[in-house]
Amino acid sequence: MGKRWDSNSSGSWDHIWSGNDTQHPWYSDINITYMNYYLHQPHVTAVFISSYFLIFFLCMVGNTVVCFVVIRNRYMHTVTNFFIFNLAISDLLVGIFCMPITLLDNIIAGWPFGSSMCKISGLVQGISVAASVFTLVAIAVDRFRCVVYPFKPKLTVKTAFVMIVIIWGLAITIMTPSAIMLHVQEEKYYRVRLSSHNKTSTVYWCREDWPNQEMRRIYTTVLFATIYLAPLSLIVIMYARIGASLFKTSAHSTGKQRLEQWHVSKKKQKVIKMLLTVALLFILSWLPLWTLMMLSDYADLSPNKLRVINIYVYPFAHWLAFCNSSVNPIIYGFFNENFRSGFQDAFQFCQKKVKPQEAYGLRAKRNLDINTSGLLVHEPASQNPSGENLGCRKSADNPTQESLMEETGEATNSTET
């Protein structure tokens, strides 16, 4: 795996292992430095395994359920849900390829697999992370168009598929240079102690081998800009515009609308808080890892600082970043009332007989679409012959307020069944 998504390969080990303190997992000789196969004491290793298993379990279960619910329920085959489905797929890849390999890299010395696995795993890890981030941006764009510009046509299913193809194509393009530069290298001055019988083995690392440090820095900067800085800026700007648009919806209400203002105000607060949660989670989960990667390439750190960063700080930063893939199904799915109804339908959790009024309500809910941050939007019941949605709006009087009610999962007074 490359230096981008794991810790042992994140820096030059020529400057990390030094000293002859036998309390640490390395021992120095005149020309050779020996290190233990396991990098940590058993209790530290147990903490690493437990914490990574927790997010792995949440990631696999949560995102698998999201995929199952979207596939099983035909009424959930909508534009926003396809984006959420794509997000779940990319997050599943993060769980399958990033979490176990990174955990292994955090607790043992060296790369235990071959050269082909080095390139493949590094490429898939980078692609899955990039695709997950780009899909978050696509979801934000979809919600931004619907709430801020409610009179404009919604994205069609065809357009959504094109965007998904572009997302994966862009992710592959961005991460290909990393896969090309990934190589398994033998450490000439380091060996691994396999047992107490003084048996040793050659150490191999899977890491990017750039011609010079300047090229590595340029590529790291490009990744930082395209996978973190630009997506973060777009998400924050669009969600801020959505929040501002929702905040202004009831400024000029009269008559019957005044009776609804208190309820609408509560809905606004709920939506705005959820938007802030999405943005903050994205910022906080990825910022430490990107900070470390930029420091590794640009800062002139001492050997002791490099050792501490690679052995202790990087594992936590990766764990925090991977948490984003574990909480995404909760934020974009299970906080959504309509999604929970779809979950119950898919797994046949509803045991009691549904009353006629409740059946009507369930049919109405099935015209709702999962939205970002647990928000909902009605999918228009009528479409033109080409399959294009006629628009996000439901009311010409106050389309943004109507979008607000729909965004929060409240059924409007529609007569469609």
Curated annotation (Swiss-Prot):
InterPro entries: GPCR_Rhodpsn (IPR000276), GPCR_Rhodpsn_7TM (IPR017452), NPFF_rcpt (IPR005395), NPFF_rcpt_2 (IPR005397). The chain crosses the membrane at residues 46-66, 83-103, 120-140, 161-181, 218-238, 275-295, 311-331. Belongs to the G-protein coupled receptor 1 family. Residues 67-82, 141-160, 239-274, 332-417 are cytoplasmic. Its main location: membrane. GO terms for cellular component: actin cytoskeleton; plasma membrane. Glycans are attached at residues 8, 20, 31, 198. Residues 1-45, 104-119, 182-217, 296-310 are extracellular. GO terms for molecular function: G protein-coupled receptor activity; neuropeptide receptor activity; opioid receptor binding. It comes from Rattus norvegicus. It is a multi-pass membrane protein. Residues 378-417 are annotated as: Disordered. Receptor for NPAF (A-18-F-amide) and NPFF (F-8-F-amide) neuropeptides, also known as morphine-modulating peptides. Can also be activated by a variety of naturally occurring or synthetic FMRF-amide like ligands. This receptor mediates its action by association with G proteins that activate a phosphatidylinositol-calcium second messenger system. GO terms for biological process: cellular response to hormone stimulus; G protein-coupled receptor signaling pathway; neuropeptide signaling pathway; regulation of MAPK cascade. PROSITE patterns: G_PROTEIN_RECEP_F1_1, G_PROTEIN_RECEP_F1_2. It comes from the Eukaryota. Disulfide bonds join 118-206. The keyword Lipid metabolism does not apply. This is Neuropeptide FF receptor 2. PANTHER family: NEUROPEPTIDE FF RECEPTOR 2, NEUROPEPTIDE RECEPTOR-RELATED G-PROTEIN COUPLED RECEPTOR. Keywords: Cell membrane, Disulfide bond, G-protein coupled receptor, Glycoprotein, Membrane, Receptor, Transducer, Transmembrane, Transmembrane helix. It is found in: Cell membrane.
